[in-house]
Amino acid sequence: MLVQRLGYMRSAVVGLLTMTAGCLLFLPASTSGLFVTFLGALFVLASGITIIQVVANPLISALGEPATAHSRLTFAQAFNSLGTTLFPYVGAILILGTLATVNETGLTGEALAALRAQEARVIDHTYVGIAAALGLLAAVVWLFRNRLAETRRPVTNPLASFALLARPRFAFGALGIFLYVGAEVSIGSLLTNYLMQADTLALPAQAAGERLAFYWGGAMVGRFVGAWLLRRFRPANVLLTVAGSAIGLIAISALSTGLVSGTTLIMVGLANSIMFPTIFSLASEGLGHRAAEGSGIICMAIVGGAIIPPLTGLAADLTTLRGATIVPLLCYTGIMAFARYCRVHVLLSERTESGNAPATELA
C-alpha cells in the first residue's frame, strides 16, 4: 500500500528514515537500561529494513531486461551477505571493544554506575554514526526521487494482496522462501554445537563459533558467482542444482563423522547463496504492477526463520543433532520441488510459443 501511494523511490526514503529513527531510539534505550526499550528500538529498525526489502527487491528486478532479473537480484543480495559477514566483526569492535574485557563481578555503587555509563556512551556513538549514514543515504535517494518514471496506482485494500496466493507459482514461491529461510537459520543455529560434538570436529565453543563465519561467508561468495551463472543458465535449473546439492551435503554430513561431517554441513551455506533471490524472482515473474504487493507477501514468508528452527530444536531433543538435520533436508526438498515446477513451466511456455503444444496456464 505504501508503494502504491508514494512510489518506489519515496517509499525507499521512508524505509531509510524509519531505520534512522530506530537507530536513534537506541540512545534513550541505552540510557534507561531497560530491555523493553531496546526491543522497541529494534522493532522500529526492523520495520525500516522490511520496507527497504519490500521496495528494493521488485525495483532491482524491474531495472533492466526481465531475462537478467535473477542475476541482478542475486548480485544485489551478495552485498546483503557481505554486510552479514563483515559487520558482526565491526559491531563487536565498535560496541564491545575493551568493554568485553571488563569483569563486572565485584563492582558496586559508583564504579558499576560508571561502567554502565561508559557502555551507554559506546552504544550511543555507534548508533548515532549508523543513523547519520542512513540519513545521508535517504537524502541522496530523495534527490533522485524523480529519476524513475513511475505510474501511481489507486491504493487498494492491503488484504487484496493475498489474492496473489491464488496463483500456484507465486504461492509455491512464497512457500519456498518460508522453507529456505527456515532451513538456513536452522543450520546456522545448530552448527556451533554440531561442530563441538566429539564425533564431528570436537572443537571448543569459541573455535566452533568462528567456523560459523564460513557458513555465512559461503552465501556471500556464492551470490557473487551465482550472479554470473544466472546469466548463462536457466534460473530454475540453477535452483534445482543448488537445492539438490544442499540435500546431498546434509545427507553426507549426517551419515559421516569427523572433518567430512563438519565441512559438508558448512558448505550448505554455499548452496544457500542464490536461493532467496532466485526463488523471489521466479515467484514474482508476471506480477507486473503488483510486484510490490508480491514482495510484501514474500517478505512475510521469512517468518519461516522463526517457525522451523524450533521444530529443528525439537527434533534434536527427540533424537540427536544429526537426526535434527532431517528438518532442513525436507525444507530443501520442497525448494527442489518448486524449482522443478518452474522448470516444467518454462519448457511448456517455450513449446506453446513455438506452436508445439497447447497453451497451459500454470502461473
What do the PLM-derived regions correspond to, one by one?
Residues F233-I279:
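C-terminal transmembrane helical hairpin of 12-TM major facilitator-type secondary transporters
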Residues T68-E104, G296-I308:
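Glycine-rich segments within core transmembrane alpha-helices of 12-TM secondary carriers
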Residues F87-P88, A92-L96, A163-A213:
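Extracytoplasmic gate region of multi-pass secondary transporters
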Residues L17-S32, G244-T257, R340:
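C-terminal ends and interior cores of transmembrane alpha-helices
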